[in-house]
């Protein structure tokens, strides 16, 4: 059969991800901080979008000039602002007397002063402002001292300790390689090669930096950091150095090996360990840490007067934007070219979709949160031990949504409950079968039970993983030993052997102190 080109029509249906749908899906999974940043960017990009302003309170209403105007005196003195115009030629003291206020404490000592220039005649010309340059509004934050970073603190000490420009240049490069915790994370040979210096020169400058405050800064390891702090206290003797060289034994609480290596008895070893515990393993964190964002819940859950749970959105985390229809009508009349009309139409469509997407996002979050609260009512009342097994499909089926939508909604979202501020993902937990064939247990509740059992153990009766399995079975929880070990390790709880050593060491310390 000969092949020949031909045309034919075919009708079919398919799902297409439009830009608007992609935008709505993206908004669902954003955290409240990411959402604010996204909306701010849209406000900058789209001229038809504007913030929905809050109604002004009565105290912010503009004053009534008739009510504010003072009663003119009978002596024929100038009224309204005439007194200022007539007194511009007088001295500053006269103006301060007329104002009946002290201008000396309006700003802090380092704030910009009033600009006083030479005027005509014998008077002075005073340019009154709000305290900021160019007549800007007074901003108290402008007078706050800038936070001193660790690098700033070290560079200030370097300028005093190293007058030689070449050594100071080496020091500045080394300080740039010290992280926020105070540790030197660079390579001395690489710095020496970059600056054309010798390894000994760079190492010598690093030793100078290690003598700066905070004590322990510039160390290349934990043992060196602790040793620097102990040297400043003149407490780094050979026995203490031997202990610092074997911190892994200290982490395993192997005190018998430490006593043998350090050549000390149990009492001296306990004193040495106590001294190490009083040191700062991250000395740099005292200076200018990174910005810490507060954890702001997206949903509030509180108990109503009738015993039911009230679920509310946190309005502070919801950006409010509007489409400026008045401005759109104005610029639409002025649009002439096809390009301008297309741009305006795209802006209007994008703005409308954004406002609808924000509204839909808020409704979806509230719907999902309400169902989570309904499913986990026992947890809110009684605590973690009553957390139910819950998966995305259960919530999705209950509210008539796809489980991928529920997954996006619960990402990076937090609920404020009587049990604390919790991530929405916390409420979704896999199930552990019941040994008696009853209701399954949530994995998070089982973790909490394991932690409670371990916290209640004594030094003479440390629970092994096998013992934990048996105790959980007595509570009706059918769980394997490897699962107990996995849950224990996920909570950073050491093994029974290590816990026994730790508890015995603590008991020895208490006996020595007594």
Swiss-Prot record:
The free-text function statement in the UniProt record for this protein reads: Sigma factors are initiation factors that promote the attachment of RNA polymerase to specific initiation sites and are then released. This sigma factor is responsible for the expression of the nitrogen fixation genes.
Task: Show the PROSITE patterns listed in the entry.
Answer: SIGMA54_1, SIGMA54_2, SIGMA54_3
Q: List the GO biological process terms.
A: DNA-templated transcription initiation
Which GO CC terms are listed, alphabetically? DNA-directed RNA polymerase complex
Molecular function as annotated in GO: DNA binding; DNA-binding transcription activator activity; nucleotidyltransferase activity; sigma factor activity
Residue numbers of the DNA-binding region are 391-410
* Protein name (Swiss-Prot/TrEMBL): RNA polymerase sigma-54 factor
User: Which positions does the motif RPON box occupy?
Assistant: 480-488
Give the range the annotation lists for the signal sequence: none
Gene behind this chain? rpoN
* Record keywords: DNA-binding, DNA-directed RNA polymerase, Nucleotidyltransferase, Sigma factor, Transcription, Transcription regulation, Transferase
Q: Which residue ranges are recorded for the region named Disordered?
A: 52-91, 114-133, 493-514
The record ties this protein, via NCBIfam families, to:
PRK05932.1-3 (NF004596), PRK12469.1 (NF009118), rpoN_sigma (TIGR02395)
InterPro entries, per the entry: RNA_pol_sigma_54 (IPR000394), RNA_pol_sigma_54_core-bd (IPR007046), RNA_pol_sigma_54_DNA-bd (IPR007634), RpoN_core-bd_sf (IPR038709)
The record's family statement is: Belongs to the sigma-54 factor family.
Pfam families, A to Z: Sigma54_AID (PF00309), Sigma54_CBD (PF04963), Sigma54_DBD (PF04552)
- Regions of biased composition (Basic and acidic residues) lie at 52-62
